[in-house]
Regions:
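Short glycine/threonine-rich catalytic loop with a Thr-x-Gly-x-Asp
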Residues: 147
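Intrinsic disorder/low-complexity segments
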Residues: 1-37
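Hydrophobic alpha-helical segments within soluble ligand-binding/sensing domains
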Residues: 150-153
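Nucleotide and nucleotide-moiety/phosphate-recognizing core
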Residues: 21-26, 30, 36-144, 155, ...
Length: 226
């Protein structure tokens, strides 16, 4: 079964779910970011579903890692644009655009395509963070490219971009219990212990993203792959 809106959520069950302003200050050195940012920036997206009912679900781990980055570097991800929420800022001297698609998981690629086209950035400067049921809770796996692996959000991004050669940080949310429904699992919330475990790794996931920008995927893989 696919992993994306929940992995492989039938459209008959849950349609679409797989289911700032200008002077944002960078955390390091509080560098103002002008309205017209130069090219040479990174677009960092976290995947999830919009709406309070999905806020703390396993499938929204990508959103939560973006929130971690935004909080650490004082970036407001609140501008409604390109079918998503975006925030412009600086992370360790590197200009970035943080993105939380608001299309629901299965259509995440529509938002990503618009953002990349608007900023005219190369795919090499795109990083995506998302949930992975094949990894234990809190475990990370950095990859420079690869298939969707059953994740419908990534599947749509690959379809929209026409390539799977973009960096990603997979965040483990644990596999479903035997005999349970996969959709219910990814659209469900962690138990208390797993929630605390996941939260304790948000900062590490954010660090993996910055490592990809500063040192490349190979270095990030060596440092953060669990």
């Amino acid at each position: 079964m696919g992993q994306g809106s929940g992995p492989g959520v039938p459209t008959t069950k849950m349609e679409g779910i797989g289911i700032m302003d200008l002077n944002i200050l960078g955390h390091r050195g509080l560098t103002p970011v002008s309205q017209e940012m130069e090219n040479d920036m990174y677009i960092i997206a976290g995947l999830g579903n919009p709406g309070s009912e999905y806020e703390l679900t396993r499938h929204n781990i990508g959103f939560r890692v973006i929130d971690e980055l935004a909080g650490e570097y004082n970036i407001s991800v609140s501008e409604k644009k390109h079918k998503g929420l975006i925030g412009k800022g600086v992370i360790e001297g590197q200009k970035v655009v943080l993105v939380k698609p608001q299309t629901f998981m299965n259509l995440s690629g529509e938002c990503i395509r618009e953002v990349i086209d608007y900023y005219k950035e190369d795919i090499e400067h795109f990083i995506v963070v998302y949930d992975d049921i094949s990894l234990d809770v809190g475990k990370l796996r950095v990859r420079p490219k690869g298939s969707a692996g059953g994740h419908n959000g990534i599947k749509n991004i690959i379809a929209q971009l026409g390539t799977d050669e973009f960096a990603r940080v997979k965040f483990g949310v644990g596999d479903k219990p035997k005999g349970s429904d996969l959709v219910d699992h990814v659209l469900g919330r962690f138990n208390k212990d797993d929630e605390e475990l996941a939260k304790s790794h948000f900062k590490t996931a954010a660090a993996a993203v910055t490592c990809i920008m500063n040192e490349g995927c190979a270095s990030a893989m060596n440092k953060y792959n669990g």
